[in-house]
């Protein structure tokens, strides 16, 4: 049904409040139960790596992605990456990574880290320009309203018609 496009396993986090230890039986159920979904950030170890041997095309990475170098350090060249601009040290590093991925046909999608205000506008602008049709996790502010109106923007997000810098107006 395409209702689930990405499943985040949180296996790359260590020492945080969102850590999820590797769970081979759960990973196997996810792989089999959601055959079309991307699988984000599995923890790869002796027990779990074999589960993903035939699933490289579905594995996407988020937490470790901060630069071109971190993409190159992945266990295999990915087909998908979750780009969270707030993880990059500079706009230059962000754009170098996007360019690197475009040159290698690595598909991108956008993610956020609870950005509100101007940060949310930035991730919308980037998503609309570089990965508008991807399974983005960058909902417009209106979706966070406790009483949303019926006039919510739909995907894909269109780029701003009169952009100023990275603003979304």
Q: What are these model-predicted stretches?
A:
Residues 131-132:
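Short helix-capping segments at alpha-helix termini
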């Amino acid at each position: 049904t395409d209702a689930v496009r990405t499943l985040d396993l949180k296996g790359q986090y260590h020492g945080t409040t969102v850590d999820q230890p590797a769970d081979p039986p759960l990973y196997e159920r996810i792989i089999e139960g959601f055959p079309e979904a991307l699988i984000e950030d599995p923890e790869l170890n002796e027990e779990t790596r074999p589960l993903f041997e035939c699933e490289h095309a579905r594995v996407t990475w988020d937490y470790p992605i901060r630069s071109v170098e971190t993409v190159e350090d992945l266990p295999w060249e990915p087909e998908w990456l979750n780009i969270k601009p707030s993880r990059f040290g500079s706009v230059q590093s962000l754009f170098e990574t996007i360019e690197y991925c475009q040159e290698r046909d690595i598909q991108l999608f956008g993610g956020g880290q609870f950005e509100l205000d101007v940060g949310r506008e930035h991730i919308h602008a980037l998503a609309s320009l570089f990965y508008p049709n991807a399974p983005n996790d960058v909902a417009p502010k209106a979706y966070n309203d406790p009483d949303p109106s019926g006039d919510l923007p739909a995907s894909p997000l269109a780029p701003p018609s009169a952009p100023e810098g990275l603003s979304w107006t």
